[in-house]
Amino acid sequence: MDKFDANRRKLLALGGVALGAAILPTPAFATLSTPRPRILTLNNLHTGESIKAEFFDGRGYIQEELAKLNHFFRDYRANKIKSIDPGLFDQLYRLQGLLGTRKPVQLISGYRSIDTNNELRARSRGVAKKSYHTKGQAMDFHIEGIALSNIRKAALSMRAGGVGYYPRSNFVHIDTGPARHW
Protein backbone atom coordinates (compact mmCIF):
# COMPACT_ATOMS: atom_id res chain seq x y z
CA MET A 1 0.00 0.00 0.00
CA ASP A 2 2.89 2.39 0.72
CA LYS A 3 4.32 1.86 -2.78
CA PHE A 4 0.89 2.57 -4.26
CA ASP A 5 0.57 5.80 -2.25
CA ALA A 6 4.05 6.94 -3.30
CA ASN A 7 3.30 6.32 -6.99
CA ARG A 8 -0.06 8.03 -6.63
CA ARG A 9 1.61 11.09 -5.07
CA LYS A 10 4.16 11.21 -7.92
CA LEU A 11 1.37 10.96 -10.48
CA LEU A 12 -0.62 13.72 -8.78
CA ALA A 13 2.48 15.92 -8.56
CA LEU A 14 3.25 15.42 -12.26
CA GLY A 15 -0.36 16.15 -13.12
CA GLY A 16 -0.20 19.35 -11.11
CA VAL A 17 2.98 20.42 -12.91
CA ALA A 18 1.42 19.64 -16.30
CA LEU A 19 -1.75 21.54 -15.41
CA GLY A 20 0.29 24.49 -14.17
CA ALA A 21 2.27 24.59 -17.41
CA ALA A 22 -0.92 24.47 -19.45
CA ILE A 23 -2.37 27.53 -17.76
CA LEU A 24 0.78 29.65 -17.82
CA PRO A 25 0.42 32.81 -19.86
CA THR A 26 1.41 32.69 -23.49
CA PRO A 27 4.22 34.96 -24.70
CA ALA A 28 1.61 37.46 -25.91
CA PHE A 29 0.49 37.95 -22.31
CA ALA A 30 3.93 37.62 -20.72
CA THR A 31 4.55 41.36 -20.88
CA LEU A 32 1.50 41.91 -18.68
CA SER A 33 1.83 38.91 -16.37
CA THR A 34 5.21 39.86 -14.95
CA PRO A 35 5.19 42.70 -12.45
CA ARG A 36 7.42 45.22 -14.17
CA PRO A 37 7.05 48.86 -15.13
CA ARG A 38 5.19 49.63 -18.35
CA ILE A 39 6.46 52.61 -20.30
CA LEU A 40 5.05 54.13 -23.48
CA THR A 41 6.75 56.66 -25.72
CA LEU A 42 4.48 58.50 -28.15
CA ASN A 43 4.43 61.40 -30.59
CA ASN A 44 1.19 63.23 -31.37
CA LEU A 45 1.27 63.93 -35.10
CA HIS A 46 -1.31 66.73 -34.87
CA THR A 47 0.06 68.71 -31.93
CA GLY A 48 3.78 67.94 -32.30
CA GLU A 49 3.91 66.87 -28.64
CA SER A 50 5.94 63.92 -27.38
CA ILE A 51 5.59 61.95 -24.16
CA LYS A 52 7.34 59.16 -22.31
CA ALA A 53 5.10 57.85 -19.54
CA GLU A 54 5.61 55.04 -17.04
CA PHE A 55 1.91 54.40 -16.52
CA PHE A 56 2.28 51.18 -14.48
CA ASP A 57 5.00 50.63 -11.86
CA GLY A 58 4.77 46.85 -11.56
CA ARG A 59 2.21 46.99 -8.76
CA GLY A 60 -0.44 49.37 -10.07
CA TYR A 61 -1.29 52.25 -12.33
CA ILE A 62 0.38 55.59 -11.67
CA GLN A 63 -2.43 58.15 -11.63
CA GLU A 64 -0.20 61.16 -12.42
CA GLU A 65 1.14 59.41 -15.52
CA LEU A 66 -2.36 58.36 -16.61
CA ALA A 67 -3.42 62.01 -16.29
CA LYS A 68 -0.52 63.02 -18.56
CA LEU A 69 -1.54 60.38 -21.09
CA ASN A 70 -5.18 61.54 -20.90
CA HIS A 71 -4.01 65.05 -21.78
CA PHE A 72 -1.80 63.72 -24.57
CA PHE A 73 -4.73 61.72 -26.05
CA ARG A 74 -7.09 64.72 -25.79
CA ASP A 75 -9.34 65.96 -28.57
CA TYR A 76 -6.96 68.66 -29.79
CA ARG A 77 -9.63 70.19 -32.06
CA ALA A 78 -11.99 70.93 -29.17
CA ASN A 79 -9.26 70.90 -26.49
CA LYS A 80 -11.30 68.42 -24.43
CA ILE A 81 -9.82 65.77 -22.18
CA LYS A 82 -11.39 62.46 -21.19
CA SER A 83 -10.06 59.62 -19.06
CA ILE A 84 -8.65 57.02 -21.40
CA ASP A 85 -9.26 53.37 -20.58
CA PRO A 86 -5.94 52.15 -19.06
CA GLY A 87 -6.61 48.86 -20.85
CA LEU A 88 -5.84 50.69 -24.10
CA PHE A 89 -2.37 51.57 -22.80
CA ASP A 90 -1.88 47.95 -21.67
CA GLN A 91 -2.96 46.78 -25.11
CA LEU A 92 -0.50 49.13 -26.84
CA TYR A 93 2.33 48.12 -24.49
CA ARG A 94 1.61 44.44 -25.15
CA LEU A 95 1.43 45.07 -28.89
CA GLN A 96 4.87 46.68 -28.85
CA GLY A 97 6.17 43.62 -27.00
CA LEU A 98 4.80 41.32 -29.69
CA LEU A 99 6.39 43.49 -32.37
CA GLY A 100 9.71 43.56 -30.51
CA THR A 101 9.94 47.35 -30.51
CA ARG A 102 9.82 50.25 -28.11
CA LYS A 103 10.04 52.85 -30.89
CA PRO A 104 7.76 55.84 -30.36
CA VAL A 105 4.15 55.30 -31.33
CA GLN A 106 2.88 57.93 -33.77
CA LEU A 107 -0.58 58.88 -32.47
CA ILE A 108 -3.01 60.09 -35.11
CA SER A 109 -6.23 60.06 -33.10
CA GLY A 110 -7.08 59.33 -29.48
CA TYR A 111 -10.12 60.75 -27.72
CA ARG A 112 -12.67 62.58 -29.86
CA SER A 113 -15.57 64.57 -28.47
CA ILE A 114 -18.98 63.78 -29.95
CA ASP A 115 -18.94 67.13 -31.80
CA THR A 116 -15.54 66.38 -33.34
CA ASN A 117 -16.63 62.86 -34.22
CA ASN A 118 -19.77 64.19 -35.94
CA GLU A 119 -17.70 66.75 -37.83
CA LEU A 120 -15.35 64.01 -39.05
CA ARG A 121 -18.32 61.77 -39.94
CA ALA A 122 -19.69 64.52 -42.19
CA ARG A 123 -16.41 64.44 -44.14
CA SER A 124 -15.69 60.69 -44.18
CA ARG A 125 -17.71 57.50 -44.38
CA GLY A 126 -15.04 55.68 -42.36
CA VAL A 127 -15.95 57.37 -39.06
CA ALA A 128 -18.35 55.39 -36.88
CA LYS A 129 -21.36 57.13 -35.35
CA LYS A 130 -20.80 55.47 -31.97
CA SER A 131 -17.01 55.46 -32.15
CA TYR A 132 -14.95 54.05 -29.29
CA HIS A 133 -12.84 57.21 -29.69
CA THR A 134 -15.70 59.16 -28.05
CA LYS A 135 -15.55 56.82 -25.04
CA GLY A 136 -11.80 57.14 -24.54
CA GLN A 137 -11.32 53.54 -25.60
CA ALA A 138 -9.64 53.82 -29.03
CA MET A 139 -6.62 55.10 -30.88
CA ASP A 140 -5.34 55.34 -34.45
CA PHE A 141 -1.57 55.10 -34.90
CA HIS A 142 1.46 53.71 -36.67
CA ILE A 143 5.01 52.95 -35.59
CA GLU A 144 7.89 54.19 -37.74
CA GLY A 145 9.83 51.32 -39.30
CA ILE A 146 7.14 48.70 -38.59
CA ALA A 147 4.94 47.62 -41.49
CA LEU A 148 1.27 48.39 -40.91
CA SER A 149 0.42 44.84 -41.93
CA ASN A 150 2.65 43.52 -39.12
CA ILE A 151 1.03 45.85 -36.59
CA ARG A 152 -2.37 44.60 -37.74
CA LYS A 153 -1.34 40.92 -37.50
CA ALA A 154 0.07 41.39 -34.00
CA ALA A 155 -3.04 43.30 -32.85
CA LEU A 156 -5.33 40.59 -34.24
CA SER A 157 -3.31 37.87 -32.50
CA MET A 158 -4.05 39.47 -29.11
CA ARG A 159 -7.84 39.20 -29.57
CA ALA A 160 -8.09 42.08 -27.12
CA GLY A 161 -10.56 44.41 -28.86
CA GLY A 162 -11.30 46.01 -32.18
CA VAL A 163 -8.65 46.21 -34.90
CA GLY A 164 -9.11 48.41 -37.95
CA TYR A 165 -6.64 48.41 -40.85
CA TYR A 166 -6.32 51.57 -42.95
CA PRO A 167 -3.28 51.15 -45.23
CA ARG A 168 -4.29 54.05 -47.53
CA SER A 169 -4.36 56.40 -44.55
CA ASN A 170 -1.26 54.80 -42.96
CA PHE A 171 -2.71 53.77 -39.61
CA VAL A 172 -4.09 50.92 -37.54
CA HIS A 173 -6.99 51.41 -35.13
CA ILE A 174 -7.19 49.51 -31.84
CA ASP A 175 -9.85 49.75 -29.15
CA THR A 176 -10.91 48.04 -25.95
CA GLY A 177 -14.35 47.08 -27.20
CA PRO A 178 -15.34 43.53 -28.20
CA ALA A 179 -12.86 41.59 -30.34
CA ARG A 180 -13.62 42.25 -34.02
CA HIS A 181 -11.79 43.50 -37.09
CA TRP A 182 -12.29 45.33 -40.35
Curated annotation (Swiss-Prot):
Which terms are listed as keywords in the entry?
Cell wall biogenesis/degradation, Hydrolase, Metal-binding, Metalloprotease, Protease, Signal, Zinc
Effect recorded for H173A? Loss of activity
Q: Kindly give the SUPFAM superfamilies that the UniProt entry links to this protein.
A: Hedgehog/DD-peptidase
In terms of InterPro entries, this protein maps to: DUF882, Hedgehog_sig/DD-Pept_Zn-bd_sf, TAT_signal
Q: Per UniProt, where does Zn(2+) bind? A: H133, D140, H173
Q: Which cofactor does it need?
A: Zn(2+)
Q: Which cysteines are joined by disulfide bonds?
A: none
CDD domains, alphabetically? Zn-DD-carboxypeptidase_like (cd14844)
The secretion signal range is: 1-30
Result when mutating D140A = Loss of activity
One protein family per Pfam: Peptidase_M15_2
Cofactor binding mode and count: Binds 1 zinc ion per subunit.
Question: Which EC number(s) does UniProt give?
Answer: 3.4.-.-
The entry's comment on post-translational modification says: Exported by the Tat system. The position of the signal peptide cleavage has not been experimentally proven.
PANTHER family for this protein: OUTER MEMBRANE PROTEIN, PTHR37425
Which family, according to the similarity comment? Belongs to the peptidase M15 family.
What does this protein's UniProt record list under function?
L,D-endopeptidase that cleaves meso-diaminopimelic acid (mDAP)-mDAP cross-links in peptidoglycan. It works in conjunction with other elongation-specific D,D-endopeptidases to make space for efficient incorporation of nascent peptidoglycan strands into the sacculus and thus enable cell wall expansion. In vitro, is able to cleave the mDAP cross-links of soluble muropeptides and of intact peptidoglycan sacculi. Shows a weak D,D-endopeptidase activity.
- The protein, known as: Peptidoglycan L,D-endopeptidase MepK
Native organism: Escherichia coli (strain K12)
Gene name for this UniProt entry: mepK
